[in-house]
Amino acid sequence: MKLWVDADACPKVIRETIVRAAERTGVECTFVANHVVPVPKRANIHSLQVPAGFDIADNEIVRRVEANDLVITSDIPLADEVISKGAQALSSRGELYTKDTIKARLNIRDFMDTMRSSGIQTGGPAALSQTERREFANHLDRILAKR
């Protein structure tokens, strides 16, 4: 199992949690972004900078991910693609996306996108709560313990 992090929009506190888990377990972890993501110098923790552009980082993750890998992302279409390749997807808020839940999440995302396109203000996501941080860390630990 490898960890792939969609680091373009990953909150710093979640990146720190991922780094601690990778250090503790020794799992191979790569942060993929279109900007420099500072990571500690460890043999198993890497940063991969891709060119700026729409979905470039996402496409690179999809290209490299393998079955049973774990992708950390809050990007619903990316989660759908990696799940279809046999990988797992976990949001930075601690939601584990599955084959059973991802289609409903895509439908909600598309509906909200349609509303925004028609001029309706939908607002952004709430700030990451302490409960969501804990939920993320707990899910990550459970997944890594099963590998």
From Swiss-Prot:
- Entry's family note: Belongs to the UPF0178 family.
Q: Which CDD domains match?
A: PIN_YqxD-like
Which InterPro entries has this protein been placed in?
A: UPF0178
What is the designated name of this protein? UPF0178 protein VIBHAR_03247
